[in-house]
């Protein structure tokens, strides 16, 4: 009996254990299913994301390829446009007879870009604001020094095209721009209503400048020529010469420059270690005789080419109410190691020869005024030379 009870108890315990094991197995299986489901879902999400990434990459690659094609097309169009622009520019400028004439057609745009548009407060047509004799009597704080300069001697029309005929009624402007202020320093200026008559026998412009000495440095500076021939009406005016000539230290040589309707010869020289000389000539006694042309020139001890200060061309001596001669030009440059020679001549209108002449020689200084009295037989004259160095303004 006792044995049967023990057997029954063991059977019950075994059944209970079996049920517990079955329950644990069910729970483990359920947990495995949940884990497997989560893993499957995660893998599915990763697969979907990877698929989306691949799609995006494919789309990006397609967009990049499209952009590259568009950029290539734009580059091709830009190249074609540049070639067309160069072709048109070549066609538009094929008339230019020299580089200086070609540069003239672009100079104003170039100048405005580098000077007017950089906050310097200057315009293309402004003339130099630096006067002659700026440092003839320097203040104690001033430190002017000699500089290199451009000595303008002459502008000659050496030839004209067949569509023009001598004499020419010429107007326009010749200027120099230097490093001191980059503004126009007038060499020649005639408005349309005050033309100069240029003949084949005397083809030189009547220069009236510079208003101060023209400085030269290693930086490029510019000579600007814009001359026209007057027609019956403004519409019939013709461009005689348009040039931009560059100059710098070591490169200031006389040159011949062809243009559409003429060829010009610009004669100038490079003066080293110079001072500016401003000349004043005054009639102090006697009078200029009738029938005599007045010609005043200036040069240096080593320069064969004279700068003409005055050529009355006709009878008389032009003076103001105080007897001061109305010189066409009054500013020249002279090296400190040279001498300045001023010559006064009275030329017979009828005989075309020098009847009276006198010459004054000056030793240049860095500053101050030198005076010499001259006599021409029929009158006496005082020659004053004001000397000045320069500061970079």
Where is each model-derived feature located?
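Peripheral membrane interaction modules
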Residues: 77-159, 179-393
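Short coil-to-beta strand junction motifs in C2/discoidin
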Residues: 165-171, 288-293
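Long, low-complexity, compositionally biased polyampholytic IDRs enriched for Lys/Glu and Gln/Arg
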Residues: 1-87
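Intrinsically disordered, low-complexity coil segments
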Residues: 160-164
